[in-house]
A protein has these predicted regions:
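FNR/FR-type flavoprotein reductase catalytic core
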Residues: 75-140
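Ferredoxin-reductase
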Residues: 2-87
Length: 140
């Protein structure tokens, strides 16, 4: 787990009340496991003591980036929609947090089931399973 300042590379709407944020976070991208998450201090909300947890939707080790898929449900997530490339998640982004999931070693087929924004962390597991040659069915 690391504490870093993470520049925003992209942040755009992908659906009704759904946004996808790309952050430069090579230390996290290189060590994140499916099911792990990050704690984010949202700029402009430094008065709030607790950081907010967000699942990591995708990670690109070669680019050193992570992607956060989030739903706008309140003041904090509404504030996140205003972040633009060049803004920084500061003072710190903490992660990866949690134990995460590991694909079974001997697995031929897998069924991944998720709903809403809670399905976001399944994407990393999907990628890992497909790379291992597993036949994956996804139900969202």
């Amino acid at each position: 787990m690391v504490d870093i300042t993470a520049p925003v590379l992209d942040n755009h709407q992908v659906g009704p009340r759904l946004h996808l944020m790309t952050l430069s976070a090579p230390e996290i991208a290189s060590s994140i496991k499916p099911g792990q998450f990050v704690h984010m201090q949202i700029p402009g909300m430094e008065g709030h003591i607790l950081r907010r947890p967000f699942s990591v939707y995708a990670a690109d080790v070669s680019e050193g980036t992570i992607e956060i898929l989030y739903q706008v449900v309140g003041f904090g997530s509404e504030r996140m929609t205003k972040l633009a490339p060049g803004d920084e998640i500061a003072p710190k982004l903490i992660g990866p947090v949690g134990h995460g999931w590991a694909a079974p070693e001997k697995c031929e087929r897998a069924l991944l089931v998720g709903g809403g924004v809670g399905a976001a962390p399944l994407f990393l597991l999907f990628e890992q399973l497909v790379a291992a040659g597993v036949d994956v069915t996804v139900v969202l």
